Amino acid sequence: MIVVGIDHGTSGITACVMENKTVKSVFKMKRTEINEKSFLKELEKQVNLNDIDLIGVCYSMGDGIDKITDIKRVENRGVINLEGIGKKIGGGTKVYDEIKSSNIPAIVIPGLHNGVKSMDKRFNALFSHIASPEKISICYNAYKTFGFENFILSDISSNTVTLLIKDGKIFGGFDACVGAVGILHGPIDLELIRNIDADKITANEAFSKAGVVKVTDSYKGVEDTKFEIMNNYDKDEKCKLAVDSLVLSVSMEINSLMFLTPDKNVILAGSIGTWENPNVSKMIKENIDGNVLVLNRESGAIGSAMIAEDILNGKKEILGIPVDF
C-alpha cells in the first residue's frame, strides 16, 4: 500500500511518500517554486503515480467541509473563501487542482471550525475557526507516534496553533489569530486595531505581521524570515527578544489548557517547536509542569499520509472527525 500525505504550509508544500507504514521519502517545494514546476512531476521522481493508492490533501483553512472527504465530492477546494488567511501565493491552489484533475484517489482533510461538531461545543461557541487542516494531520501523527489518548499539541512555526486532544478526539484549542504568536502571524492588539480603523492596514495584513517579526527588523518574506530571526538569536538583541517573547507566549497558551488534561502530556511540533539552536523545546519545558515531547519536523505531511493509510484500512473516524470516502 502506497500513500502520499501533503502539508500545505505558510512557506511551501511538503509531501511524504509512505509504503506499508514506512516513510520512503519527504520532499518540499517552496510556494514560489510551485508556480514554475508541476507538483505531480516532482512527486513522480519519488514514486510511480500509478502505484499511489491514496493522497491525503491539506488545503488552506478547510472551513468549507466538516468531514474527511473524497476530493471528487469537495466543492470550492473545501474552503468558504480565501480572504483573511494570511499572504496568498497561489502554490497550494495549483497543487490541489493538479491532484484533483489527475486520476489519483485523494481525500481532503477539513480544518477545525465551528461546523465540526465532534469538538466541545464551548470552543465552537467561542471561535469560528480553530485550526487549518494540516494541524489535524500533525495531531494524528502525534497520536500514532506517542500513543497518548490525552495530550496538548502546540505547532509552532510561522504561526502557533495549540490543540487539546481528550479521549482520542480533538476537544478544542486556539487558532493562530487568537492566542500565542508565531514568527509571522499573531493576534491583533490595540495598536493594530487602531491602524485598521484608520485604513492604514487591512486586518489580514495586520495578522500577517503580528508575530514576533514585529519585534525585529528582519522580515525576509514568508519563506526566509524564520531563518533570519532564529540564526541571529545570539547576535542580535531584537532577534533574541523576539524568540524569548515567542517562548513566553507559547508557554502561556499551553498552560492555559493544562487544567483540562490531567495527564499533562505536551507535544511540540513545527519548524520552530523543533528548532535546536536555540533549543526552543528546552526553553518551553522550563515553563511547563508536564511531560514535554517533540515531534519530527515533517509531521504534517507524515500525518496526512497516516490518515490516508488508515482510511484505506477501514477507519471511519480520525480524532473524532468522520470520514466520507
Curated annotation (Swiss-Prot):
InterPro entries documented for this protein: ATPase_NBD (IPR043129), Methan_mark_12 (IPR016735)
Disulphide bridges: none
Source superkingdom: Archaea
Family stated for the protein in its record: Belongs to the UPF0285 family.
HAMAP family: UPF0285
Protein's recorded name: UPF0285 protein MMP0642
The organism of origin for this protein: Methanococcus maripaludis (strain DSM 14266 / JCM 13030 / NBRC 101832 / S2 / LL)
